[in-house]
Amino acid sequence: MTSASDGVPARVANPVESSAECGPSNAFAVLHPQVQRWVWEQGWATLRDVQERAIPPILAADRDVVVSAATAAGKTEAAYLPLATRLLQETSTIMGFRVLSVSPLKALINDQYDRLQGLCERLDLPLHRRHGDVSASEKGRAIKEPGGVLLITPESLEALMVLRGSQVASLFQPLCGIVVDELHAFIGTERGMQLQSLLHRLELTIRRRVPRIGLSATLGEPGLAVRALRHDGRWPCQIVQADGGGQTVRLKLHGFIERDPFRQRGSSSEDEKPPHEENQDEIITALFQTLRGDSHLVFANARGTVEIIADKLRRRCEDQHLPNEFWPHHGNLSKAIREDVEAALKQRDTPATAICTSTLELGIDIGQMASVAQIGCPPSVAALRQRLGRSGRRGSPSVLRLYVQERALTPLVSVVDLLRMRFFQTVAMVNLMLRRWTEPPRPNRLHLSTLVQQLLSLLAQRGGIQPHEAWRVFCQTGPFHGLGNNHFKQLLRDLAKHDLITQDHDGTLVLAAMGERVVNHYTFYAAFQTPEEYRLISNGKTLGTLPVDFPLAPGQMLLFAGKRWQILEINEKGRAIILTPSQGGQPPLFSGNGAWIHDAVRQEMFALYGADDVPPYLDAGAQRLLVEGRDHFRRLDLGRVRLLQEGTEVLLFVWQGDRVLHTLRFWLVAEGIKANQEWTLLRLDKCKVPEVEALLSRFVAHGPPEPLTLARHVAIKKTEKHHPYLSEELLDLELAGNVFDPQSAWEALRKTQAS
């Protein structure tokens, strides 16, 4: 079935519109005269709303500030105009960096460097950048003559702490401001915890607090950004949210049903398209017809999908003798290829569309996009909100198109297909986004892998530290406050067993032989896991890299950089794969973990099934999916029933998030029942409904399960970078807090029993 014509996406309330805590002020008047002159030279008639609101509290320098606004709303200048004023007003002659700006991506740093260069040159303020692609000579000059503004990634700041530990205090002694760019990208992540720890250690080193400024996309819950900016909340923080200015959002969700996957069986024609390719053609046609002639971003959830879609759209252009307008963009493409795509997007006179993963989700400067498209269910509400923010700049509406495909209903489809769960989850996320809700970070995460990295880094920086002082730095006053003293001691013992740390005669913790090797390896500075990657080479040119965690062999086909390749040779020692152009191809199976779905999303799905209204942004195809899903939901009486018999399996419907489902699954596993999660339900193998009802009643009577008991039944526990150094006891502790939610799982069962 094809979608209805694209038409004009429906207008809905703006999900990013908000008001500021601090009212508008004559901020321009309080800027330094040289900064005012620079503003005049830019030809600005007025400061933008977010700049008016942010300048006074940043100039006050007596609090942290979170500046929240949509992409291209002027957040960078909102931070740097008052910071530049403060630097020009200073009388101190101490050498050192005065502003530290941390960004999650090298490309963002390069963008900011170009953007700030004119301002800094005009004001005679030094501007430095430090990341993996910056030359050693440029890095060296910054260390020899530190001053002004330093733009840096968390990994390069980590390297600076390790390699220049004795110089850190002098390099940052005059520091008067810390900027965290794209703050929302750090919330709840390993890198976010790493950054919190690094900034805490930096303030301990220079022995004073430094005002922090977080620049973030529009937030559903601003308090999340406050806690991400400074972990302890012991300093006041002002939230500055830009006025939405009446901006509208145009939104359309297109629904598709794939063609019968069995209709081509028995065909012997070599020219016949494989079923998985034919099934995507309707979405490809919709994209091609709608997006041609302008600049857009199309987000797909996997790099393999990106390659397939980019390849199909490129071939459509070739078939119609048109210049190509569609290019892939993902993290495993080479820097040169990614920069070529970004440059094409910036060209206003030439249409260009990037098919991308989350690589273009953050604020890399690519100019104004006419619209954003999402293929399939978005990974989270937060990601959808951020992706929406990439369109609708400079007063024009934000335009979002979503394309969701469900399977044709045959006698063999699962209940997930009958209920159209992919579609309903997408609608639930859109509705929550429109209500300005976003996922909070998972609570109770210990981040033990990151703690291992930070402890080793601190030992490299200082040369050694007493155990009680390390506990104070990281757990008592630092961001790892969820770890008790006894478990911290266990962590030290675990690291000592692996020869990572040892103690001097006076008890001082120092790096041991293996610890020295780990810290000195170039991969140490990243807190997250970095899989083994191979370079992809054709005719001597590097196309990009591929994380290889699946079998490969010469003669195998790949899709990469939007083109089809055949593997000629695999050089294991050199970590290289030699390719030649080919007519066939399958997408490489890039690795990557899916997002966890929050309780609120599943509860919104349940409410949608039971409702009668039709969201105004659904096209005819999407409305059909809505009707089909609701019809089957009511036929199965799932508004009341939670257990269904399907052959030898029992389906348990909970309508809760993944943490609750994981908890219930391993609670059942602990009782000897094989249980598997499938979207918002659990499949219990070789069971009958009456015996499951009895077991769940016993669970409710017993009370919430013990999370450490559940953790012992998890087979794969070493999922993060430094987990191999930790004992089973600490891994179980990490799992108990990270994966399970016993109280919510028990309450969900109790409500099920009561209904």
Segments from the language model and where they lie:
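Conserved pre-motif I regulatory segment
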Residues: 21-68
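Short, charged/polar, Gly/Pro-enriched secondary-structure boundary elements
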Residues: 258-261, 515-522, 585-588, 689-694
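Accessory beta->alpha helical hairpin/"wing" motif in late/C-terminal subdomains of nucleic-acid enzymes
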Residues: 502-521, 576-583, 681-682
